[in-house]
Amino acid sequence: MKILTVANHIAILEELEKELSAVSPGSEIIRETDALMAGKYAFNHEVDIVFAEADMKRMNGLQLIQFVRHKHPDVKSFLIGTDEDLSGFWGGVSEDVTGILTYPFIKKTIRDTLRKNGL
């Protein structure tokens, strides 16, 4: 499984990668701090899952997810962020978004979220 993780800060990506590696060993995890570069990567490569920070520079997480799903309609996609970052998305999340994860990431929460979505 190929997982694309996108966030402004490398520390967030490292934490997410650590938890994803524990939950889904053997998955290839691609980290990117630039949403536009992540979109370019997804346009040129097959990805199975995208975790995108809601509040990013140049392009927000929802815009990135919509861009990726245009190329890969079956990709599973998750917005990540703090409760405050995600407050604008509660109750109004686009059908493009599979789910939402809040910081701090907890292995059990990630595992339950992936299982709930058939992954």
Region locations from a protein language model:
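The feature encodes the CheY-like receiver
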Residues: 57
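Conserved acidic segment of CheY-like receiver
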Residues: 1-12, 16-17, 50
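C-terminal output helix
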Residues: 105-114
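Two-component/phosphorelay signaling modules centered on CheY-like receiver
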Residues: 10-30
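Alpha4 helix (beta4-alpha4-beta5 surface) of REC/receiver domains from two-component response regulators
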Residues: 83-99
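Acidic catalytic/metal-coordinating carboxylates
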Residues: 34, 60-63
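Acidic, metal-coordinating helix/loop segments flanking the phosphotransfer/catalytic sites
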Residues: 31-49
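Short amphipathic alpha-helix used as the core "switch/output" element in two-component signaling
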Residues: 40, 62-73
